[in-house]
């Protein structure tokens, strides 16, 4: 945190974006209280029993988050929803942001509940909070005072110990109501869906380092319709299990909600640990409560991808993708075990077999975690996430510092080190896809509940995955393929109960027409004792039956222009059977779709800056999508 604040102060000074200037703006320009749109009594336009693919971002911050406002973010929840619907918004560094690929179908502001909306009031002349010595230090021109004041807020969020003088429940409650109102105001059933939501900001403090570095245990909490008058935060308790208790209580009072954990990759191995928050053994009650409240997990976002890690999946050639492993506000490396979803699936199956419960039956989603109200989903149009801290190519380390034209002699200072350790390693990711009957809160939330969701690293590729016992290759070209798939099996997120015979799987993917062509579709199989990756559909034809791999389709990138070379597929589909299926063994299956190679955002920025790409990050990537799994359950 100290490093980040020091860099912020320098960036603010360099950009002449003075975050210490008094805040005279209104928190919201639209202040009329809005009730949520009533549940539709008639189906909206576009309703489909076979379900439509809708895309959205479930993790967005505004000026009301303490770690956005300090970095000169001044945009509101209303601005966030306008951005998602296609309006151009100004970045804190002064340039325009317009969403790549056109308007999204759904969007959610998830400001940190801790000290929600407090910093803007501390920086508003004449308020009681502005008179506090802590406020005067935080918005002074003294870097040491700014850093110390903001660190104290971070320490409070991590410990759960309230700073009484700045904890004004009336302000926090008012801003929470404003965020709810903004979600209600911009919700248009059938066109654009929003949810009242917030972030629960739990962090495990790393005792080995004298800083605020720690493991990320954050959750975003979403309400299906109405939301309660207050949000449960780490200032109530940093223990996620206490959050689940509160959610159960709210559900009994009519407030249906789910929580979605994110960035398990930097949880220091704590997100999927094999014991409770307080170190007790896991049990059936824990598993049931976790799955009731956390049916999904955010698998990819700007701070990296949490599917798997090369050390956990050494035989997966595509495991080393956008790996980010630095603890929050630290250069220290997060522990790998306990931090990745595929390993959690394996451990969950083992617990099911040995203990009779599985607390890790998550569906998959993705988001940006943007703190500037709008996500950067396109590698060729990237603006990172924090604000003025990483608002330029130099600040995020994609071009050499201070006008140099090569990477040989970079200065040894905090800005350079932060760019190397953090910002250059971040990713232009991601988006959630859902299969829902219509674009409404009820339909999309129900898709969350049944885990008929998929995650992408930014492109809006559509992916379906089914399992059953009646699928055949003859179905693939039928006009009613989707209806047959639903009628003959279960979709992603479902359980397939054994019948004594081997199931068949149906995988289908369609490219985003504005992004790269498809290279392959894979099925990832996980059991309690191992894993395997099978190519099941290839641009080049059928996979090799011995290696289960597609042949090379020759796709590449022209590194002078970032233009793709070679061909790829617009659509890939296959009916597949597991060649090593064991009728008696539980297994988890999910689909991973890979695009052809494309330039990473850092390469795009280096090309525009007429400098060589940064040598310590990949020059190209393969954008991808991940479906929620299907769980095979042997017959009794």
Where do the protein language model's features map onto the residues?
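C-terminal functional module detector
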Residues: 18-77, 81-84, 88-136, 168, ...
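Sec-dependent signal peptide recognition
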Residues: 2-8
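The substrate-binding groove and active-site-proximal loops of carbohydrate-active enzymes
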Residues: 66-71, 160-173, 224-237, 329-339
């Amino acid at each position: 945190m100290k490093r980040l604040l020091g860099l912020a102060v320098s960036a603010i000074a360099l950009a002449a974006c003075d975050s210490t200037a008094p805040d005279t703006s209104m928190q919201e320009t639209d202040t009329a209280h809005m009730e949520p749109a009533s549940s539709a009594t008639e189906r909206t336009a576009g309703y489909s029993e076979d379900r439509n693919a809708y895309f959205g971002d479930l993790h967005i911050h505004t000026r009301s988050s303490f770690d956005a406002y300090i970095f000169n973010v001044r945009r509101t929840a209303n601005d966030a929803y306008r951005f998602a619907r296609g309006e151009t918004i100004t970045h804190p560094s002064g340039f325009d942001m317009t969403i790549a690929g056109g308007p999204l179908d759904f969007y959610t502001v998830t400001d940190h509940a801790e000290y929600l909306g407090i910093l803007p009031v501390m920086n508003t002349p004449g308020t009681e909070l502005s008179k506090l010595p802590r406020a005067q230090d935080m918005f002074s021109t003294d870097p040491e005072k700014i850093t110390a004041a903001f660190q104290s807020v971070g320490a409070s969020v991590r410990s759960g110990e309230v700073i009484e003088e700045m904890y004004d429940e009336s302000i926090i409650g008012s801003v929470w109501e404003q965020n709810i109102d903004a979600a209600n105001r911009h919700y248009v059933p059938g066109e654009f869906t929003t949810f009242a939501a917030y972030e629960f900001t739990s962090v495990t403090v790393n005792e080995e380092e004298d800083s605020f570095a720690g493991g990320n245990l954050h959750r975003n909490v979403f309400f299906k319709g109405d939301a309660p008058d207050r949000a449960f935060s780490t200032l109530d308790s940093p223990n996620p299990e206490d959050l689940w208790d509160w959610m159960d209580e709210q559900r009994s009072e009519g407030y249906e909600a789910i929580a979605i954990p994110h960035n398990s990759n930097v949880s220091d191995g704590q997100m999927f640990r094999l014991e409770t928050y307080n170190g007790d053994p896991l049990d059936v009650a824990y598993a049931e409560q976790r799955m009731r409240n956390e049916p999904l997990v955010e698998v990819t976002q700007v701070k990296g991808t949490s599917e798997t890690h090369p050390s956990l999946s050494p035989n997966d050639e595509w495991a080393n993708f956008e790996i980010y492993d630095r603890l929050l506000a630290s250069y220290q490396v997060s522990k790998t075990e306990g931090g990745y979803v595929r390993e959690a699936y394996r451990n969950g199956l083992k617990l099911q077999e040995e203990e009779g419960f599985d607390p890790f039956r998550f569906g998959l989603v993705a988001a940006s975690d943007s703190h500037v109200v709008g996500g950067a989903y396109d590698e060729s149009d990237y603006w990172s996430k924090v604000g003025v801290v990483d608002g330029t190519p130099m600040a995020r380390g994609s071009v050499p510092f201070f006008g140099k034209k090569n990477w040989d002699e970079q200065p040894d200072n905090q800005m350079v080190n932060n760019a190397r350790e953090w910002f250059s390693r971040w990713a232009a990711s991601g988006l959630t896809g859902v299969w829902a009957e219509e674009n409404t809160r009820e339909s999309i939330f129900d898709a969350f509940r049944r885990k008929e969701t998929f995650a992408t690293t930014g492109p809006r590729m559509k992916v379906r995955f089914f399992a059953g016992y009646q699928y055949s290759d003859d179905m693939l070209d039928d006009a009613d393929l989707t209806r047959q798939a639903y009628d003959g099996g279960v979709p992603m997120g479902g359980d397939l109960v054994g019948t004594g015979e081997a199931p068949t799987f149906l995988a289908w993917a369609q490219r985003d027409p504005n992004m790269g062509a498809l290279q392959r579709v894979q099925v990832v199989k996980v059991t309690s004792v191992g894993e395997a990756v099978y190519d099941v559909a290839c641009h080049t034809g059928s996979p090799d039956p011995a290696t289960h791999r597609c042949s090379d389709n020759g796709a590449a990138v022209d590194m002078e222009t970032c233009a793709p070379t070679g061909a790829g597929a617009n659509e890939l589909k296959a009916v597949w059977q597991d060649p090593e299926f064991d009728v008696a063994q539980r297994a988890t299956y999910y689909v991973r779709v890979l695009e052809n190679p494309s330039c990473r955002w850092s390469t795009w920025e280096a090309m525009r800056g007429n400098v060589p790409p940064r040598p310590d990050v990949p020059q190209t990537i393969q954008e991808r999508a991940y479906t929620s799994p299907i769980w095979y359950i042997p017959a009794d």
